[in-house]
Amino acid sequence: MPALQAGRGSGAKIAVAGAIWGASLLLSRVVGLVRDLVVGRTLGTSGEGDLWQAAFTIPDFLNYLLAGGALTVVYLPIAAGHLALGDEAGAQRSFRRVWSLLLALLVLATVVLWWSTPRILDLIAPGMGAERHAELAALVRILLPAQICHVLGGLASAWLQARDKHAAAASAPLLYTLGIIVGGLLGGDVEGFCWGALAGSIVGPLCVPTFAALRGGLRLRFEWTPRDR
């Protein structure tokens, strides 16, 4: 009987998680469509639309460089393994070490890319006029810090998912997209969309899952020790 009850409990958790992520996916499609409509109506087929697309080139490279999306997949079994053994201290410790390392790498990479943005644009967009070049560089620099939010927030989401808590992680992309929409509507130009993307990244991918993890018992601090003493 205990095994049967445990199986039913596990099945219920899977069903709830599936419902949450299914609803999130559906809402993300709807909100994403609204975002595309707002971007299209606001920027149209002007040069600003091209700037909006080009502004993500360097930030997306930073995310790719640090394998932001893959980190959640990699960390989940690590956290689940600690929890399966009842090792809460180990789960806390492993999270802090990964989080601390990522934060250091992200800040360093962001600073380097922020400083190098004009030179990188010379390589990937040669022949661009000086005014357009300066405008694109400014947009890229607005978006670069957002990658810190996405990567660290993804790690916090993995912490929550390992504990079968999915609502905060599932709502993060929705809030990010809503930030883009609100920024574009308020600003009315490509810069407004970029500021909205940054604000949405802070609120959605970073703050919501991180605060949920802290409320759920995560004790977050810098920890650099490579091995247990």
Tell me the role of every PLM-derived stretch:
Residues M1-R229:
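Membrane-embedded alpha-helical bundles of multi-pass transporters/translocases
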